[in-house]
From Swiss-Prot:
GO BP terms, alphabetized: riboflavin biosynthetic process
Pfam families: DMRL_synthase
Amino acids binding 5-amino-6-(D-ribitylamino)uracil: 22-23, 56-58, 80-82, 113, 135
Recorded metabolic or biological pathway in which this protein acts: Cofactor biosynthesis; riboflavin biosynthesis; riboflavin from 2-hydroxy-3-oxobutyl phosphate and 5-amino-6-(D-ribitylamino)uracil: step 1/2
Record note on quaternary structure: Forms an icosahedral capsid composed of 60 subunits, arranged as a dodecamer of pentamers.
Active site: 88 (proton donor)
The name this protein goes by in its record: 6,7-dimethyl-8-ribityllumazine synthase
InterPro entries for this protein: LS, LS/RS, LS/RS_sf
Cross-referenced Gene3D superfamilies: Lumazine/riboflavin synthase
Keyword set, alphabetical order: Riboflavin biosynthesis, Transferase
Gene Ontology cellular component annotations, sorted alphabetically: cytoplasm; cytosol; riboflavin synthase complex
Family, as annotated: Belongs to the DMRL synthase family.
Gene from which this protein is expressed: ribH
Positions contributing to (2S)-2-hydroxy-3-oxobutyl phosphate binding: 85-86, 127
Amino acid sequence: MQIYEGKLTAEGLRFGIVASRFNHALVDRLVEGAIDCIVRHGGREEDITLVRVPGSWEIPVAAGELARKEDIDAVIAIGVLIRGATPHFDYIASEVSKGLANLSLELRKPITFGVITADTLEQAIERAGTKHGNKGWEAALSAIEMANLFKSLR
């Protein structure tokens, strides 16, 4: 039996990060976490392309452009959505997650989900580097593992 698992080394890999500017104080912490994860796992900052977009709605289209680049091994999507009083949150959260999943399947390239979807500001803060870890770091770790897995499967 052959078993494939992605290695947790970023050495020699190139990553794209697409990050929204909306809720930038929290998004910046997620971006810092993602970059820290890549570097701690042997990657280099010069092998990371960071693209800033206005909000989470724009993340999938920019992620698709990055993922189409042959020199990018994986894309990390980063944003923060906080529920408000209207259904806007539900529409954005649903479409962003579906858009990223569909792109990853269509392009056959890892696109990981580092978009916090929180009911409250407190929940978002907890997931941006405090009580519940840093979701940017976690998304980067998944990107490292999946990029290596794809390389071994091809």
